[in-house]
Amino acid sequence: MAFQLRIVQHLLHITFLRLPLAYPSQIHQRENERMFLLRIHRQDVQHLSHRRLRQLNEHRSLLPKGFPFKLLRPLPQLQRLLSQVCRGSVRIDACCCIPSCH
């Protein structure tokens, strides 16, 4: 199942794909501590300034080369990272379930 989150302030549309639980201990984690796959689409990244885009690229342990960018982090860490990368603070405004074949 996938979740589409909309960051209203920056009009960035990102897709969170729930990852399968790798270890039984993860089952006991709170929902917002689960690991998600974040995909930032090309058209959204182009709205960022070059300096912010470089800052995003500096997270080499998080980001593979090319598009779409992928981050593997618990949801609160993702929100903090996006707040650092984007202009000003980032607020994840809406979350809705969408059909997914994953």
From Swiss-Prot:
The keyword Metal-binding does not apply. Belongs to the RxLR effector family. Induction: Expression is up-regulated at the earlier infection stages. Its main location: secreted. Effector that partially suppresses the tobacco programmed cell death induced by cell death-inducing proteins. This is Secreted RxLR effector protein 61. It is found in: Secreted; Host chloroplast envelope; Host cytoplasm; Host nucleus. The keyword Signal applies. The gene is RxLR61. One of its GO terms (cellular component) is host cell nucleus. A motif (RxLR-dEER) lies at residues 51-60. It comes from Plasmopara viticola. The RxLR-dEER motif acts to carry the protein into the host cell cytoplasm through binding to cell surface phosphatidylinositol-3-phosphate.
